[in-house]
Amino acid sequence: MSKKLVAYFSASGNTAALAKSLADKAGADIYEIRPSVPYTNADLNWQNKQSRSSVEMSDHSSRPELADTSADIAAYDTIYIGFPVWWYIAPTIINTFLESYDFSGKKIILFATSGGSGFGKTVENLRTSAPNAEIIEGKVNPSAKDIEVLAEMD
């Protein structure tokens, strides 16, 4: 049995709730991916082209700074990574997270929340940030049954 970690970024709390449920079902440790400067409601206003999230997502080289890099990635075989889908891809803080650690030989299983889109180009975009990891597209807005299925993936 592999050692599992659920790492997640949650701007509104929706992804956090799923992450906690998945960690419980998978018997995994949990780690919150936090920006050094927390997002405000104004930052998350996708309808404002000048909002922080809009600016970050329009610049694919944007790498928001992490609050910490204390996750012991080397100790895990399987890492679930959860996030809200923004502009059909993962928020760029997920790229920051992936580029901050060595994921070589790790299995990464993605899960996400979304107001209406699927993964889009998420997997393709994240592979460039963790090229030596196996990245698996999990589920968007997973149901309780989907969480059970994800928990068994390793």
Predicted regions and their residues:
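N-terminal beta1-alpha1-beta2 submodule of the flavodoxin-like/Rossmannoid cofactor-binding fold
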Residues: 1-78, 88-90, 95, 99, ...
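Alpha-helix N-cap/loop-to-helix initiation residues
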Residues: 12, 87, 115-119
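A structural micro-motif
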Residues: 26-28, 106, 133-134
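Short, conserved loop/helix-junction motifs that constitute active-site signature segments
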Residues: 73, 99-105, 128-130
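Glycine-rich, N-terminal phosphate-binding loop of Rossmann-like dinucleotide-binding domains
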Residues: 83-84
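Short, glycine-/small-residue-rich phosphate/pyrophosphate-handling segment
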Residues: 109-146
